């Protein structure tokens, strides 16, 4: 602590100072020191707040993924291109299917148009093993690739899933006449795709029945099909819907679809759902509303064929709410469109229904009874028809 020069001289001359004078001096110096420390802390905190404010402003300026998609003008969907009916490329890069229609539906909602919808989507084929890494890396915006919703994918993989768009179950496909039940498949080789829930389910199912098997894993269905044709596998296990699609396109020179049998046993539950990054909940909520919207539209009888009629006369109940028309508020007696707060235009479902139709239309167009897959609705029927497809209310 430095002593003022005048005081030093006074002390040196007199040789001593009264105790009361020393006490006053020390008190004054202590107060000055505390004030200096407090000022320094205030400056540090102010600097920290300024830095934090700058960072928050930068994040706000950056916007969300939904904002980025709107700015970009296209929606990038990670898809499959090897599963007939769901995501399949017959050649020339023309991928189509059940999941592709959901990509179209999402784009129709985001951009609120049904015009030239394929110009608003970018389909990015991705294999099962790399789909989550690619999502985290920002290679695409939304995963629409027959993906099972599980706890670890929801948590560790960082995926925010939407309402399941297809409830499935794992099955086993074999050559006709070789096996009648999975219980007969002891000491067999089973082909499976890597990076899927199918691998784990296969091991669990066979272990529970004390069956020995050799798993032969492949990265994609093209490699797996080649191995199956070569006789390297006694069975091919995957989601039943996938096996139905693959069977429907089985080469004629290998016996065609009639040469294969999908056995009746259901090896697991497979709720298939679209997903996006769990850091992008605005996008997740917006697209989840689309999945629920097409299911609700089927329940209410609104389709691609009659949506324009309902736009002209929507009433004031659930159909009006679905289509973004004014809805009667029983408390106020007034009518106004519902404010969903989803980052979408209020009438986004009109564009969705014009582009792809309701859930039943999408199902029947790609995988239903009159397609090569010939799937029945089963548990994917509406809850009013004995299934478990059930949409949240548009309220």
Language-model regions, residue ranges each:
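Short, Lys/Arg-enriched N-terminal segments with co-localized hydrophobic residues
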Residues: 1-16
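Bacterial N-terminal signal peptides that target proteins for export
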Residues: 15-26
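C-terminal motif of bacterial Sec signal peptides marking the signal peptidase cleavage site
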Residues: 34-38
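Extended ligand-binding regions for polar small-molecule ligands
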Residues: 40, 53-60, 104, 108, ...
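Bacterial lipoprotein signal-peptidase II cleavage site
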Residues: 40-49
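Extracytoplasmic small-molecule ligand-binding "clamshell" domains
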Residues: 58-64, 68-143, 330-332, 344, ...
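Bilobed "Venus flytrap"/periplasmic-binding protein-like clamshell domains
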Residues: 76-85, 95-112, 148, 168-226, ...
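Acidic, polar ligand-binding/catalytic clefts
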Residues: 104, 108, 115-184, 243-268, ...
């Amino acid at each position: 602590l430095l002593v003022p020069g005048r005081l030093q001289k006074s002390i040196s001359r007199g040789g001593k100072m009264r105790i009361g004078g020393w006490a006053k001096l020390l008190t004054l110096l202590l107060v000055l020191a505390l004030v200096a420390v407090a000022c320094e802390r205030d400056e540090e905190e102010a600097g920290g707040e300024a830095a934090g404010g700058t960072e928050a402003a930068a994040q706000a300026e950056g916007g969300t993924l939904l904002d980025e998609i709107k700015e970009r003008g296209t929606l990038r969907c990670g898809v499959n291109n090897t599963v007939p009916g769901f995501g399949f490329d017959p050649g020339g890069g023309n991928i189509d299917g059940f999941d592709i229609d959901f990509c179209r539906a999402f784009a129709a909602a985001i951009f609120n148009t049904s015009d030239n919808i394929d110009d608003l989507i970018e389909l990015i084929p991705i294999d099962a093993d790399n789909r989550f890494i690619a999502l985290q890396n920002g290679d695409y915006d939304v995963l629409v690739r027959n993906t099972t919703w599980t706890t670890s994918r929801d948590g560790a993989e960082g995926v925010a899933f939407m309402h399941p768009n297809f409830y499935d179950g794992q099955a086993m496909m074999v050559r006709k006449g070789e096996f009648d039940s999975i219980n007969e498949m002891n000491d067999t080789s089973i082909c499976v795709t890597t990076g899927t829930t199918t691998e784990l389910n296969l091991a669990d199912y066979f272990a529970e029945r004390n069956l020995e098997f050799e798993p032969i894993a492949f990265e994609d269905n093209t490699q797996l099909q080649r191995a199956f044709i070569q006789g390297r596998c006694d069975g091919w296990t995957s989601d039943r819907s996938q096996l139905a699609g693959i069977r429907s396109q089985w080469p004629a020179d290998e016996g065609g679809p009639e040469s294969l049998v999908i056995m009746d046993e259901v090896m697991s539950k497979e709720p298939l759902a679209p997903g996006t990054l769990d850091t992008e909940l605005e996008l997740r909520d917006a697209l989840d509303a689309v999945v629920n919207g097409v299911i609700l539209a089927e329940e209410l009888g609104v389709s691609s064929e009659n949506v324009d009629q309902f736009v002209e006369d929507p009433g004031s109940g659930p159909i009006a709410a679905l289509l973004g028309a004014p809805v009667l508020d029983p408390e106020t007696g007034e009518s106004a469109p519902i404010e969903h707060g989803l980052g979408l235009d209020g009438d986004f479902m009109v564009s969705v229904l014009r582009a792809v139709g309701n859930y039943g239309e999408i199902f029947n167009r790609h995988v239903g009874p009159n397609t090569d897959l010939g799937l029945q609705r089963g548990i994917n029927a509406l809850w009013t028809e004995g299934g478990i497809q059930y949409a949240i209310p548009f309220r």
